[in-house]
Swiss-Prot record:
InterPro entries: Beta_CA_cladeB, Carbonic_anhydrase, Carbonic_anhydrase_CS, Carbonic_anhydrase_sf
Function field: Reversible hydration of carbon dioxide.
Disulfide bonds: none
Top-level taxonomy: Eukaryota, Viridiplantae, Streptophyta, Embryophyta, Tracheophyta
Protein's UniProt name: Beta carbonic anhydrase 5, chloroplastic
Encoding gene, per UniProt annotation: BCA5
Species of the source: Arabidopsis thaliana
Catalytic activity, reaction form: hydrogencarbonate + H(+) = CO2 + H2O
Annotated keywords: Chloroplast, Lyase, Phosphoprotein, Plastid, S-nitrosylation, Transit peptide, Zinc
GO cellular component, as recorded: chloroplast
């Protein structure tokens, strides 16, 4: 059963198609949206407190019975979570898998995604939910702050995914997606240059140090939240620039068989910005050491 497409209004960049992405800070708060009613779940910790009060009021002696009640409540809460998950899976099987059985049967034999998506691990920004990717559409990598490490650095799961998707799956597009209020970017902006080297988070987000430096150079007078928003977008472009440092990626981009794109999802006002790397114009900027050029910028709102 084909889903009815959602229509968006698209406004195109009024500037030259090869101009650099305008990274100026935009308003954080957008229009109000209607609220969706959700089912209230009472946390297990609150239920335990209520149970304790009931025991005290009834005059019963706290002990093994009280402890057993707490364990039972925890188990019930855990069961509720997986019951919900089970129902979502069964709904998927009935409404999608069985309704498009031939497609899923073909996917069981092979995959041929058109996109490699590099997105943040943040639970609020699932690219499949936000952009409607279906199984088989996009090979997806998610890490803190949607960063691309330098080609020269050691092996990482992100670099392995790049190699596999580009050289084996032959994806036609790489889309790096950043987002508003990114905790990884906030950690990067707060981080001291000589931070705790034992921290996994520090050792990862330092990959985006160049974006932090460029943000501090042009936006140091702004409020910290606005600096972070600036860095969120700057980091996307620095990751796109890094991708061109992978020889086999740059070769395919040069041949025209692979395109690099940036995206920024603002979940505060539900807008999405998209742009594409202009490789020809970026080559000149690479020689100048001034970053990349972009084209085809649009805002979906």
């Amino acid at each position: 059963m084909a889903a009815t497409p959602t229509h968006f209004s698209v406004s195109h960049d009024p500037f030259s198609s090869t101009s650099l992405l305008n990274l100026q800070t935009q308003a954080i708060f957008g229009p109000n949206h209607s609220l969706k009613t959700t089912q209230l779940r009472i946390p297990a910790s609150f239920r335990r407190k209520a149970t304790n009060l009931q025991v005290m009021a009834s005059g019963k002696t706290p002990g093994l019975t009280q402890e057993a009640n707490g364990v039972a409540i925890d188990r019930q809460n855990n069961t509720d979570v997986f019951d919900d998950m089970k129902q979502r899976f069964l709904a998927f099987k009935k409404l999608k898998y069985m309704d498009d059985f031939e497609h899923y049967k073909n996917l069981a034999d092979a995959q041929a995604p058109k996109f490699l998506v590099i997105a943040c691990a943040d639970s609020r920004v699932c690219p499949s939910a936000v952009l409607g990717f279906q199984p088989g559409d996009a090979f997806t990598v998610r890490n803190i702050a949607n960063l691309v490490p330098p080609y020269e650095s050691g092996p990482t799961e992100t670099k392995a995914a790049l190699e596999f998707s580009v050289n084996t799956l032959n994806v036609e597009n790489i889309l790096v997606i950043g987002h508003s209020r990114c905790g990884g970017i906030q950690a990067l902006m707060k981080m001291e240059d000589e931070g705790d080297s034992r921290s996994f988070i520090h050792n990862w987000v330092v990959v985006g140090k160049k974006a932090k430096e460029s943000t501090k150079a042009v936006a140091s007078n702004l409020h910290f939240d606005h600096q972070c928003q600036h860095c969120e977008k700057a980091s996307i472009n620095h990751s796109l620039e890094r991708l061109l440092g992978y020889p086999w990626i740059e070769e395919k981009v040069r041949q025209g068989s692979l395109s690099l794109h940036g995206g920024y999802y603002n979940f505060v006002d539900c807008t999405f910005e998209k742009w594409t790397v202009d490789y020809a114009a970026s080559r000149g900027k690479k020689k100048e050491g001034s970053g990349i050029a972009v084209k085809d910028r649009s805002v979906w709102s």
